[in-house]
A protein has these predicted regions:
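Non-catalytic beta/alpha edge segments that cap or flank active sites
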Residues: 1-163
Length: 163
């Protein structure tokens, strides 16, 4: 069982002006898939705060999988992908590509996602859309291969990608 964190990135959620439904929904999905969700937070759309939370989850807490929800769109304050890429050491472009492909099957607006994913130390970080529906569709599109990716990340070289 791998540890996981869910970070909701929302100015209104942080200020208590909007109820976060995406974060708790992602927590439930992760638990159903066998993850141990050990950390959750709600932070504003502030680049430095996003980076600090991601680094904390990776470097201090040693969490295997970190999901963010929110801040991946076109609004001027949507800077989650940029903050994540500031601290990611090894990009994993196939994950957001798969999420966008699945989203495009549902709506042409799926191409507007700016989600990114990558590895920092031994933590896989995936940025998801802010809506409950889109974040659920996106994570369900990739969670099974992500679990295998974590097996490889934690295997010390003994896991086979072809399996």
């Amino acid at each position: 069982m791998y540890t996981a964190a869910v970070i909701t990135i929302s100015d209104k959620g942080y200020r208590g002006e909007r109820v976060d439904t995406s974060g708790p929904n992602l927590v439930e999905i992760l638990k159903e898939k066998g993850f141990d969700v050990t950390y959750t937070s709600i932070i504003p759309d502030e680049r430095e705060m996003i980076k600090e939370e991601l680094v904390k989850c990776s470097d201090e807490l040693g969490i295997a999988l970190v999901l963010t929800t929110g801040g991946t769109g076109f609004s001027p304050r949507d800077i989650t992908p940029e903050a994540a890429m500031d601290i990611i050491e090894r990009p994993t472009p196939g994950i957001p590509e798969a999420m966008r492909a699945e989203s495009m099957r549902i709506t042409p607006k799926g191409c507007l996602s700016r989600s990114v994913a990558g590895i920092r130390k031994r933590t896989l970080i995936i940025t998801l859309p802010g809506s409950k529906k889109a974040s659920q569709e996106n994570i369900l599109a990739v969670i099974d291969p992500v679990a295998h990716g974590l097996d490889m990340l934690y295997s010390e070289g003994s896991a086979d990608c072809a399996k």
